[in-house]
Structures are given as C-alpha cells and as structure tokens.
Curated annotation (Swiss-Prot):
The modification N5-methylglutamine is found at residue 237. Keywords: Cytoplasm, Methylation, Protein biosynthesis. It is found in: Cytoplasm. One of its GO terms (molecular function) is translation release factor activity, codon specific. Methylated by PrmC. Methylation increases the termination efficiency of RF1. Belongs to the prokaryotic/mitochondrial release factor family. Gene3D superfamilies: 3.30.160.20, 3.30.70.1660, 6.10.140.1950. The lineage of its organism: Bacteria, Pseudomonadati, Pseudomonadota, Gammaproteobacteria, Oceanospirillales. It comes from the Bacteria. This is Peptide chain release factor 1. It comes from Chromohalobacter salexigens (strain ATCC BAA-138 / DSM 3043 / CIP 106854 / NCIMB 13768 / 1H11). Peptide chain release factor 1 directs the termination of translation in response to the peptide chain termination codons UAG and UAA. One of its GO terms (cellular component) is cytoplasm. The keyword Protein biosynthesis applies.
Length: 361
C-alpha cells in the first residue's frame, strides 16, 4: 500500500480515537446536536478503521511468518509457509476492503430517486423501447426490494411511453442507479418492418436524487405558478372529471413538472413538489459536474442527456456500456432485471477512479 494512503489512514484513525474520547465527555453528551454529529462521523469511520486495524495486524502476522520461514527445523518451515500464504491472502482481501472504504461516499447514495425516461429519435420504436427500459428497471427494483411508483406518464401511440417519470424508493437507490443517466441506444428489427432491416432508436434516462429534507432545496411560493387540469390517460382521453392533475412552474428557472397519476389533487401536488425539488437539486449538481468534466472524466457524467452511454443490440443479444468498454452477450437477462451485471462493473470502475484521484492528491 502506498505511503500516501497509509498517512491518510493513520489520520483517520487519530480522528476516530478523538471522536471516541469526545463522545464520552459529559458536555458533549448534554449537547444533542454535537453528540449526534460526532456519533454520525464515528459510525461512518468505524468500518474503515476496523479494516485498517485488521490490515495492520495481518501485516504483523505476515512478518512473523516470514521470519519463521528461515527456521532450521523443516516442519517449522512448512508450517510457516502455510501461515505465510494464509496471511498473504488475508492481506490482499483487506487491502481491497480498505481501499473500497476509503473512497468518499456520495452524500446522495442513500437517497431515493426520480427516474425519467424519454423517447428520443425513432418515433414509435423509441416509445416502445422506453417501455422496455421501464420494465427493466421495475424488474431490477423488484429483485433488490425497492418500491417503484409512476409519477407521470405520456403513453406512445403504439405502446410504451413518450415520457415517464417514476419515483424509486429503497436502500441505496441513488448509489446503484446514478450511472444510468444518459442516452440509451437500441438496435433491433421493429415488428412493423417487413424487410427485416435493423432500426436504431434511442431514449434518454435521467436519475435525480430526491431532496432528503425540506430545507435542502429552498422553494419560495412566490416563485411558483400552480395550474390544475384534468387527468388524461392513453390516447388523451380524460380519466377524471375533476381538476386533480397538477402542473407547477418554477418561474426563475423555467422548470415545469406535472403529476396526474393520483385521483387526489393534494397527493399530486405533493409528488409534483418533490419532483421539482429533485430537479432543482439536480440542476445544481449538473452544473458542478460540468465544471469537474473540464478537468477529469467521470462515469456519472456531466448531466448531458445526449451523452451516449449504452447500446442494446437485440439481433446479437448484446449490451455494451461505452464508458468502460463493457460488452455482455446477456441482453435477455439484463432486460429481465439482471441489471447488476452492468451496474457492478460500473461501480467498481468508479471506485477505482476515485481511489486513483485520492492517491494523486
């Protein structure tokens, strides 16, 4: 392990021990705000420090076994050789654990998200693919125990969606889905294609962390215009005789959100406000990432919806993620919800990228 990482880890251990002492002080215990903040920091550091301490102990075990390998007794040397191999294997595993835990956690990783899917180039075929993508995400959500609900949907004429917005709730949703933002391209033969020609169409996906607290995004009522209208279903027919659907316009930014999935105007308004807060938060994040993109590549992207990230080739059963040159011939499995096959390599690459930046700093 590099000396720079060791120095950083020793610093974290000193802070961890300092926090343990602070949490035992009566004046800190009496101050709920300080006690809560210190407890949170302590809990965040604890897994890293435990792994680092285990790493240091295993280094000592390895050194002891190394010395025993020089023993004059053949049986002792054989025993030492076995202990050395075991210690070496443990050290390699702990090295990976420490580095993984050292990567700074995105503060939004534990957040729920709003998932937007929009049909792009390709007309009806793009809308059908938007429906396929939503089913893929829904099946993945079911597999990992998340809950998904549609906030707003505009149906395609031949099926699928022109646009769909869903809220996804569960453990570490943003941590798993944040790499999905961008342009998703599909190559396949449409059902209406009599010549068997492959068509290319695309959808854009945006993943926005839900604002976790009311005060995280400031929404001034004077900056909002709220309109009501009747909900409509597929084909434009009205499905509700009351003006329960809500459209909110954020006047300073021009952002517009709608929600019409609930029969209650109150519920639609609450969901629309949550979506607006998430979009405003995402706008600020995108601006920050755009600045970062000028200096380094980021797998999360700059927030540009046109950034092509993935191709789904149905004739070949192939899915390719262009950011990490990942190609899998498991398209059927991925579309059936085995999205972890793509997400996990992206997370590993992102963590390696973050660790490299840490080592260079």
């Amino acid at each position: 392990m590099k000396a720079t990482l060791r120095t950083r880890l020793d610093g974290f251990q000193e802070r961890f021990e300092e926090l343990a002492a602070l949490l035992a002080e009566p004046d800190v215990i009496a101050d709920q705000a300080r006690f809560r903040d210190y407890s949170r920091e302590y809990a965040e550091l604890e897994p890293l420090i435990e792994a680092w301490r285990s790493y240091r102990r295993t280094e000592d075990d390895l050194e002891a076994a190394e010395q025993m390998r020089e023993d004059s007794d053949p049986e002792m040397r054989e025993l030492a050789e076995e202990e050395w191999r075991e210690a070496q294997a443990r050290l390699e595993a702990l090295d990976a654990d420490v580095k993984r835990l050292l990567v700074p956690r995105d503060p939004d990783d534990a957040s729920n998200v709003f998932l937007e899917i929009r049909a792009g180039t390709g007309g009806d075929e793009a809308a059908l693919f938007a429906g396929d993508l939503f089913r893929m995400y829904s099946r993945y959500a079911e597999k990992v125990g998340w809950r998904i609900e549609v906030i707003n949907a505009s149906h395609g004429e031949q099926g699928g969606y022109k646009e769909l917005i869903a809220r996804v709730r569960g453990d570490n949703v943003y941590a798993r889905l944040k790499f999905e933002s961008g342009a998703h391209r599909v190559q396949r033969v449409p059902a209406t294609e009599s010549q068997g020609r492959i068509h290319t169409s695309a959808c854009t996906v945006a993943v926005m962390a839900e604002a976790s607290a009311v005060g995280e995004v400031e929404l001034n009522s004077n900056d909002l215009r709220v309109d009501t209208f009747r909900s409509s279903g597929a084909g434009g027919q009205h499905v509700n005789t009351t003006d329960s659907a809500i459209r909110i316009t954020h006047l300073p930014s021009g952002l517009v959100v709608e929600c019409q999935e609930e029969r209650s105007q109150h519920k639609n308004r609450a969901k629309a406000m949550a979506l607006l807060a998430a979009r405003l938060k995402q706008s600020a994040v995108d601006a920050q990432r755009q600045q970062q993109a000028d200096t380094r590549r980021s797998l999360v992207g700059s927030g540009d919806r046109s950034e092509r990230i993935r191709t789904y080739n149905f004739p070949q059963g192939r899915i390719t993620d262009h950011r990490i040159n990942l190609t899998l011939y498991k398209l059927g499995d991925v579309m059936a919800g085995e999205l972890g096959e793509v997400i996990d390599p992206l997370i590993h690459e992102y963590q390696a990228e973050q660790l490299s930046a840490l080592q260079a700093s």
